Amino acid sequence: MFAIIELGAKQFKVSPDQVFVAEKTGNTVGSTVETKVLLLSDNNKVNIGSPALSGAKVTLKVLEDCKGEKIHGFKYKKRKNYKKSWGHRQQLQKLQVVSISG
């Protein structure tokens, strides 16, 4: 059994008890999240929503907050003595699929 869910602006293929990393949802550690289900597959039966399935739901549990790799940016203008650098680390959350129903 697996489902395609939409979390934020991204889609993920998930199955029961799977742990995955996604962008931060704004929920606290230990809380549960219910997501929009786009596709639900159970052995040979496949249900496709347009755009989402109304009766299906996937429950996720927030395990921990973490950060992605650091990305470095650099801007430079020749002969003007102008240099600017910056860095960014994306806020992420580790999520576990608790249940898939529908």
From Swiss-Prot:
Keywords: Ribonucleoprotein, Ribosomal protein, RNA-binding, rRNA-binding. The keyword Plastid does not apply. The keyword Lyase does not apply. One of its GO terms (biological process) is translation. InterPro entries: bL21-like (IPR028909), bL21-like_sf (IPR036164), Ribosomal_bL21 (IPR001787). One of its GO terms (cellular component) is cytoplasm. SUPFAM superfamilies: L21p-like. GO terms for molecular function: rRNA binding; structural constituent of ribosome. It comes from the Bacteria. Disulfide bonds: none annotated. Belongs to the bacterial ribosomal protein bL21 family. This protein binds to 23S rRNA in the presence of protein L20. Part of the 50S ribosomal subunit. Contacts protein L20. This is Large ribosomal subunit protein bL21.
